[in-house]
Amino acid sequence: MKSDKLLGNRGLSIKKNSTDINLKGFSGYELKHSKEIDDEITRIGPGTKAGEYFRRYWHPIFISSELGDLPVAIKILGEELVLFRDQSLQLGLVHKHCPHRQASLEFGICQKTGISCCYHGWHFDVDGSILEVPGQPEHTQDFIKQKVRLGAYPTHEFKGLIFAYLGPIEKKPEFPNYDSLDFDGMEMVPYKAPFDCNWLQVLDAIV
Protein backbone atom coordinates (compact mmCIF):
# COMPACT_ATOMS: atom_id res chain seq x y z
CA MET A 1 0.00 0.00 0.00
CA LYS A 2 1.21 3.52 -0.78
CA SER A 3 1.12 5.91 2.17
CA ASP A 4 0.10 9.56 1.82
CA LYS A 5 0.72 12.36 4.33
CA LEU A 6 0.02 11.97 8.02
CA LEU A 7 -3.24 13.51 9.13
CA GLY A 8 -4.33 14.97 12.41
CA ASN A 9 -6.05 12.97 15.14
CA ARG A 10 -3.52 10.14 14.70
CA GLY A 11 -4.99 9.24 11.31
CA LEU A 12 -3.35 8.13 8.07
CA SER A 13 -4.76 8.43 4.58
CA ILE A 14 -3.85 5.36 2.50
CA LYS A 15 -4.61 4.64 -1.11
CA LYS A 16 -6.02 1.11 -1.41
CA ASN A 17 -7.40 -0.27 -4.67
CA SER A 18 -7.70 3.29 -6.00
CA THR A 19 -9.86 4.30 -3.02
CA ASP A 20 -8.64 6.67 -0.30
CA ILE A 21 -9.44 5.50 3.22
CA ASN A 22 -8.73 7.33 6.43
CA LEU A 23 -7.23 5.11 9.13
CA LYS A 24 -7.60 6.24 12.74
CA GLY A 25 -7.94 4.27 15.94
CA PHE A 26 -10.08 1.11 15.73
CA SER A 27 -9.46 0.65 12.00
CA GLY A 28 -9.90 -3.12 12.04
CA TYR A 29 -12.54 -3.12 9.33
CA GLU A 30 -10.44 -1.07 6.92
CA LEU A 31 -7.37 -3.22 7.46
CA LYS A 32 -8.94 -6.67 7.49
CA HIS A 33 -8.75 -7.12 3.74
CA SER A 34 -5.43 -8.63 2.72
CA LYS A 35 -3.45 -7.43 -0.25
CA GLU A 36 -4.23 -9.01 -3.59
CA ILE A 37 -2.27 -12.20 -4.25
CA ASP A 38 0.08 -12.30 -7.24
CA ASP A 39 -1.00 -15.68 -8.59
CA GLU A 40 1.75 -15.77 -11.19
CA ILE A 41 4.52 -16.20 -8.62
CA THR A 42 2.78 -17.45 -5.48
CA ARG A 43 0.76 -20.36 -6.88
CA ILE A 44 3.01 -23.41 -7.26
CA GLY A 45 0.58 -26.24 -7.91
CA PRO A 46 0.59 -28.35 -11.09
CA GLY A 47 0.02 -26.28 -14.23
CA THR A 48 0.79 -22.90 -12.65
CA LYS A 49 3.56 -20.68 -14.02
CA ALA A 50 5.67 -20.69 -10.87
CA GLY A 51 4.89 -24.36 -10.32
CA GLU A 52 6.23 -25.27 -13.76
CA TYR A 53 9.35 -23.23 -13.10
CA PHE A 54 10.05 -24.93 -9.76
CA ARG A 55 9.43 -28.35 -11.31
CA ARG A 56 12.59 -28.01 -13.40
CA TYR A 57 14.82 -28.31 -10.32
CA TRP A 58 15.65 -30.73 -7.50
CA HIS A 59 14.05 -29.93 -4.13
CA PRO A 60 14.86 -31.13 -0.59
CA ILE A 61 11.70 -32.82 0.68
CA PHE A 62 12.58 -34.89 3.75
CA ILE A 63 15.31 -35.72 6.26
CA SER A 64 16.66 -39.20 5.56
CA SER A 65 16.93 -40.24 9.20
CA GLU A 66 13.25 -39.43 9.81
CA LEU A 67 11.98 -41.87 7.19
CA GLY A 68 11.30 -45.19 8.90
CA ASP A 69 9.68 -48.44 7.84
CA LEU A 70 6.27 -46.90 7.15
CA PRO A 71 5.21 -44.68 4.23
CA VAL A 72 4.81 -40.97 4.97
CA ALA A 73 2.30 -38.57 3.41
CA ILE A 74 3.85 -35.27 2.34
CA LYS A 75 2.78 -32.27 0.27
CA ILE A 76 5.31 -30.84 -2.18
CA LEU A 77 4.59 -28.00 -4.64
CA GLY A 78 0.88 -28.42 -4.00
CA GLU A 79 0.89 -32.18 -4.72
CA GLU A 80 -0.28 -34.84 -2.27
CA LEU A 81 2.44 -37.51 -2.31
CA VAL A 82 3.70 -40.51 -0.35
CA LEU A 83 7.37 -41.10 0.41
CA PHE A 84 8.64 -44.55 1.38
CA ARG A 85 11.70 -46.78 1.50
CA ASP A 86 11.11 -50.37 0.42
CA GLN A 87 12.74 -53.41 2.02
CA SER A 88 15.59 -53.22 -0.49
CA LEU A 89 16.23 -49.64 0.72
CA GLN A 90 15.05 -48.08 -2.54
CA LEU A 91 13.32 -44.73 -2.16
CA GLY A 92 9.91 -44.17 -3.70
CA LEU A 93 7.94 -40.93 -4.11
CA VAL A 94 4.50 -41.55 -5.57
CA HIS A 95 1.06 -40.03 -5.92
CA LYS A 96 -0.87 -40.42 -2.71
CA HIS A 97 -3.83 -42.37 -4.10
CA CYS A 98 -3.80 -45.81 -5.70
CA PRO A 99 -5.06 -45.64 -9.33
CA HIS A 100 -7.32 -48.65 -8.69
CA ARG A 101 -9.79 -47.41 -6.03
CA GLN A 102 -8.05 -44.25 -4.80
CA ALA A 103 -7.06 -45.68 -1.41
CA SER A 104 -4.27 -43.72 0.28
CA LEU A 105 -0.83 -45.27 -0.12
CA GLU A 106 0.10 -43.61 3.15
CA PHE A 107 -1.30 -46.84 4.58
CA GLY A 108 0.46 -49.02 2.00
CA ILE A 109 2.86 -51.87 2.77
CA CYS A 110 6.53 -51.51 1.87
CA GLN A 111 7.61 -54.65 0.01
CA LYS A 112 10.99 -56.07 -0.96
CA THR A 113 10.51 -54.06 -4.13
CA GLY A 114 8.16 -51.09 -4.09
CA ILE A 115 4.88 -50.68 -2.24
CA SER A 116 1.50 -52.41 -2.24
CA CYS A 117 -1.89 -50.84 -1.59
CA CYS A 118 -3.60 -51.82 1.67
CA TYR A 119 -7.02 -52.05 -0.02
CA HIS A 120 -6.74 -54.58 -2.88
CA GLY A 121 -3.02 -55.29 -2.80
CA TRP A 122 -2.00 -53.72 -6.10
CA HIS A 123 1.79 -53.74 -6.06
CA PHE A 124 3.87 -50.91 -7.56
CA ASP A 125 7.58 -50.47 -8.19
CA VAL A 126 9.30 -47.24 -7.13
CA ASP A 127 8.98 -45.90 -10.70
CA GLY A 128 5.19 -46.33 -10.61
CA SER A 129 4.98 -49.40 -12.83
CA ILE A 130 2.66 -52.21 -11.72
CA LEU A 131 4.26 -55.44 -10.52
CA GLU A 132 1.16 -57.34 -9.39
CA VAL A 133 -2.62 -56.92 -9.60
CA PRO A 134 -4.04 -59.62 -7.29
CA GLY A 135 -7.71 -60.42 -7.66
CA GLN A 136 -7.90 -59.39 -11.32
CA PRO A 137 -8.81 -61.95 -14.00
CA GLU A 138 -5.74 -63.59 -15.51
CA HIS A 139 -6.55 -62.43 -19.04
CA THR A 140 -6.67 -58.75 -17.95
CA GLN A 141 -3.47 -58.57 -15.93
CA ASP A 142 -1.05 -57.90 -18.79
CA PHE A 143 -3.37 -55.22 -20.16
CA ILE A 144 -3.60 -53.50 -16.76
CA LYS A 145 0.17 -53.58 -16.28
CA GLN A 146 0.68 -51.97 -19.69
CA LYS A 147 -2.02 -49.30 -19.42
CA VAL A 148 -2.08 -48.27 -15.75
CA ARG A 149 0.64 -46.40 -13.89
CA LEU A 150 1.02 -44.88 -10.46
CA GLY A 151 2.47 -41.39 -10.68
CA ALA A 152 6.06 -41.42 -9.37
CA TYR A 153 9.01 -39.03 -9.19
CA PRO A 154 12.80 -39.52 -9.11
CA THR A 155 14.57 -39.10 -5.77
CA HIS A 156 18.16 -38.63 -4.64
CA GLU A 157 19.78 -38.79 -1.21
CA PHE A 158 22.56 -36.35 -0.38
CA LYS A 159 24.11 -35.27 2.92
CA GLY A 160 21.26 -36.65 5.00
CA LEU A 161 18.49 -35.14 2.87
CA ILE A 162 16.08 -36.66 0.37
CA PHE A 163 15.64 -34.63 -2.80
CA ALA A 164 12.99 -35.00 -5.50
CA TYR A 165 12.48 -33.83 -9.07
CA LEU A 166 8.82 -33.23 -9.94
CA GLY A 167 9.10 -32.10 -13.56
CA PRO A 168 9.03 -33.78 -16.99
CA ILE A 169 11.37 -36.75 -16.89
CA GLU A 170 12.95 -35.85 -20.24
CA LYS A 171 14.02 -32.48 -18.78
CA LYS A 172 15.44 -33.86 -15.53
CA PRO A 173 18.76 -32.13 -14.76
CA GLU A 174 21.75 -33.78 -13.17
CA PHE A 175 21.71 -33.48 -9.40
CA PRO A 176 23.86 -30.43 -8.55
CA ASN A 177 26.84 -31.19 -6.32
CA TYR A 178 28.08 -27.75 -5.30
CA ASP A 179 31.61 -27.30 -3.96
CA SER A 180 30.17 -25.15 -1.17
CA LEU A 181 28.42 -28.24 0.23
CA ASP A 182 31.60 -30.30 0.58
CA PHE A 183 34.23 -28.81 2.88
CA ASP A 184 37.09 -30.94 4.19
CA GLY A 185 36.77 -31.63 7.90
CA MET A 186 33.19 -30.38 8.09
CA GLU A 187 29.98 -32.34 8.49
CA MET A 188 26.61 -31.16 7.21
CA VAL A 189 23.75 -31.68 9.65
CA PRO A 190 20.28 -31.45 8.06
CA TYR A 191 17.48 -29.68 9.89
CA LYS A 192 14.01 -28.38 9.13
CA ALA A 193 12.23 -25.16 10.07
CA PRO A 194 8.52 -25.21 9.15
CA PHE A 195 6.94 -21.91 8.08
CA ASP A 196 3.16 -21.62 7.77
CA CYS A 197 3.23 -19.22 4.83
CA ASN A 198 3.88 -18.93 1.12
CA TRP A 199 7.37 -19.62 -0.23
CA LEU A 200 7.70 -15.99 -1.36
CA GLN A 201 7.29 -14.69 2.18
CA VAL A 202 10.14 -16.93 3.35
CA LEU A 203 12.35 -15.66 0.54
CA ASP A 204 11.51 -12.03 1.36
CA ALA A 205 12.43 -12.64 5.00
CA ILE A 206 15.88 -14.12 4.33
CA VAL A 207 17.06 -11.97 1.42
Regions found by a protein language model. Give the residues of each.
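Rieske [2Fe-2S] iron-sulfur-binding subdomain
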Residues: 1-91, 111, 125-207
